């Protein structure tokens, strides 16, 4: 009796497996290769709209979705360069995106104003990236090597006038990690080797910096708390694994 039950159970399992295999939908290589890629979904400040990048046109362009009507419009119509959305201006609602020129990998930051794209980080050899917004949301942070191709400085751009101002001059090859919510502190990192990475806290107001990494180990910056009272980072000092630490400002 037991043997019969076992045989019946095995038979049912085999039938179930065969059915599952038969129900697997097959796709051609042409279908798989024709799938669209999308990235960078960003909401407007009032959460009524969403922008994202997609290569559904054959190359990455910017698309906007009205979340009330589900209607979608294509904001850019590039035929050569890929355009990647970076968000809306929280003040003006204008679209910010990045793109290189001819695939040279030197990305610039653009704003769409009155239907036209304006390059906020011009320069033939300039490479720039979006770094967020100031606390009052009136200025945009941008990292750029415009001054010196070897180093990336921090700038802020007035979103109304589009004038730029240098916040941090980087002559030592620091990596720029994050800036505090109140715009007063900038966290920098410096890679010395695979086993040692230093971490620094730079005071934007006084132009002074202190080292957070007081030991020879890997220190990796994370973020500030909401009130900018502490900065969180991870380290593997005297440990096989990374653990979370905080630095009181």
Q: What do the PLM-derived regions correspond to, one by one?
A:
Residues 35-53, 80-98, 109, 124-143, ...:
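Conserved beta-propeller blade repeats
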Residues 103, 117, 125, 149-150:
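Preference for long, solvent-exposed alpha-helical segments and helix-linker "stalks"
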Residues 15-16:
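C-terminal motif of bacterial Sec signal peptides marking the signal peptidase cleavage site
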Residues 103, 148-149, 161, 193, ...:
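Short flexible coil/turn linkers enriched for glycine and charged/polar residues
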Residues 2-8:
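Sec-dependent signal peptide recognition
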Residues 66-70, 112-116, 158-162, 203-207, ...:
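Short loop/turn segments that connect beta-strands within beta-propeller blades
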Residues 27-33, 71-77, 116-122, 163-168, ...:
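A short beta-strand motif characteristic of beta-propeller blades
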Residues 51-77:
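Beta-propeller domains
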């Amino acid at each position: 009796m037991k043997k019969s039950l076992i045989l019946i159970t095995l038979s049912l399992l085999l039938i179930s497996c065969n059915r599952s295999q038969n129900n697997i939908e097959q796709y051609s290589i042409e279908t798989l290769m024709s799938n669209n890629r999308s990235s960078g979904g960003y909401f407007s400040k009032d959460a009524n709209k969403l922008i994202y990048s997609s290569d559904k046109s054959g190359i990455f362009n910017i698309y906007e979705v009205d979340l009330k009507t589900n209607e979608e419009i294509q904001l850019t119509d590039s035929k050569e360069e890929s355009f990647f959305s970076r968000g809306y201006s929280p003040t003006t609602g204008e679209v910010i995106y990045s793109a290189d020129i001819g695939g040279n990998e030197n990305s610039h930051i653009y704003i769409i104003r009155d239907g036209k794209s304006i390059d906020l980080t011009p320069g033939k050899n300039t490479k720039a990236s979006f770094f967020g917004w100031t606390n009052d949301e009136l200025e945009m942070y941008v990292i750029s090597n415009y001054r010196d191709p070897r180093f990336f400085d921090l700038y802020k751009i007035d979103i109304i006038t589009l004038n730029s101002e240098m916040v941090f001059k980087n002559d030592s090859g620091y990596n720029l990690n994050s800036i505090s919510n109140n715009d007063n502190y900038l966290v920098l990192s410096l890679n010395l080797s695979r086993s040692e990475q230093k971490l620094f806290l730079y005071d934007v107001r006084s132009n002074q910096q202190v080292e957070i990494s007081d030991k020879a180990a890997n220190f990796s910056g994370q973020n500030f708390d909401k009130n900018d009272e502490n900065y969180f980072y991870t380290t593997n000092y005297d440990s096989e694994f990374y653990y979370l630490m905080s630095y009181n400002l």
